[in-house]
């Protein structure tokens, strides 16, 4: 858990620093002031939104490529064998029922039962399953998992969470810069440029706000997970989806799913304390099963 938070903060700080330098070198802030937009907070908010959304959309645009590289996923271009043929045809069948373009289909080598979907557009997505899923699940259970991933694509969850991340990034950047400027000018009486007080306060505020932002993003991720379960129940059948989740309860906890894909997988890291649950991308499996049991067949 601490590693995930540290990676989030490090990435957020790196994006802010790099994009801030680039935009300042391009003279964007000076241009805005010359156009009469000299209200400091307005300029700062524009910068925050640009930086906040840029990082999210760059990650989204690269998501398929990065997912394939990080997971070592091998795309199925020409199915080899009955199992790969079944996998491709199952994805195609669900995609057609949802009215979306055929996603790329891939398999990655991992012992745990898991799968993920990613991609910038509904009609150009990627659905990947682990070798452990194909080896340890029945066809009915695997079908439900595939339906879950196709539902993520059909619901546009990748773009939705990217927009949410962009919004929270904007406020993290904006509020941390406001705090830094306040301390720099009011406490250290520095009216020219950004002194040490600004940088120390800004980075500290960004770390604190980044943790809160992660909690917000994970809250929405958990909500989208319930919706994907419901979509899978519609596509594959409620009982199949419940059976798949029951199988996941008895499976090995996923360890090597990168955070970028975990939110769109079928199985996330198990929670412990109430605090840890706030950072979970997936609801507890028991809650997901109970939600499906309350859904009409």
Swiss-Prot record:
One of its GO terms (cellular component) is plasma membrane. The active site is at 149. CDD domains: M48B_HtpX_like (cd07335). Pfam families: Peptidase_M48. Binds 1 zinc ion per subunit. GO terms for biological process: proteolysis. The gene is htpX. This is Protease HtpX. Belongs to the peptidase M48B family. The keyword Protease applies. GO terms for molecular function: metalloendopeptidase activity; zinc ion binding. It is a multi-pass membrane protein. Its EC number is 3.4.24.-. Its cofactor is Zn(2+). InterPro entries: HtpX_protease, Pept_M48_protease_HtpX, Peptidase_M48. Its main location: membrane. It is found in: Cell inner membrane. Zn(2+) binds at residues 148, 152, 225. The chain crosses the membrane at residues 5-25, 41-61, 158-178, 196-216. Keywords: Cell inner membrane, Cell membrane, Hydrolase, Membrane, Metal-binding, Metalloprotease, Protease, Transmembrane, Transmembrane helix, Zinc. The keyword DNA repair does not apply. HAMAP family: Pept_M48_protease_HtpX (MF_00188). It comes from Halorhodospira halophila (strain DSM 244 / SL1).
